Design a protein with these regions (language model features):
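Eukaryotic proteins' extreme N-terminal regulatory segments
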Residues: 2-36
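Short beta-rich binding modules
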Residues: 4, 38, 58-63, 98
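An extracellular/secretory-lumen and virion-surface interaction module
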Residues: 25, 39-40, 56
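Short acidic, glycine-rich loop/turn motifs
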Residues: 36-42, 68-70, 96-100
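Short coil-to-beta-strand transition motifs
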Residues: 41-51
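Amphipathic protein-protein interaction modules
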Residues: 49-93
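Helix-rich interaction surfaces within compact, conserved domain-sized segments
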Residues: 78-115
Length: 115
């Protein structure tokens, strides 16, 4: 059973480091879809079925970084970060609410199909 959790800013680095180490191994076949949604931009796909190599938070730049097989993507100034966590700790979805009100949606699958 999954659980939706709000991740406190002071826990972001540790939370996503633990997730990345446990589930995003070099041979992991998992894939991510990334989309930015905002009133000024509408819904804009950033990545589709791209291999997710890691998730990291940098407190100095205040950015949550997605390390993707196609290149890195950063969500700056996250006001809120939510994660859908499966019973084994796998994060299947991340929602980042930025200071400007836009949202970054990341859906992560364990299966094959990543590019």
């Amino acid at each position: 059973m999954s659980e939706t959790k709000r991740i406190a800013r002071d826990q972001l680095n540790r939370y996503f480091d633990t997730f990345s180490r446990k589930f995003l191994m070099p041979d992991s076949p998992g894939a991510a879809d990334v989309e930015v949604v905002g009133s000024e931009v509408g819904a804009q796909p950033v990545a589709n079925r791209v291999r997710l190599l890691g998730v990291d938070y940098d407190p100095h730049t205040n950015a949550l970084e997605l390390e993707l097989g196609s290149g890195d993507h950063r969500a700056y100034n996250p006001r809120e970060v939510w994660a859908v966590e499966e019973s084994d700790g796998f994060v299947s979805s991340i929602q980042i609410v930025r200071d400007d009100g836009a949202k970054e949606l990341v859906n992560i699958s364990r299966g094959s199909g990543a590019r």
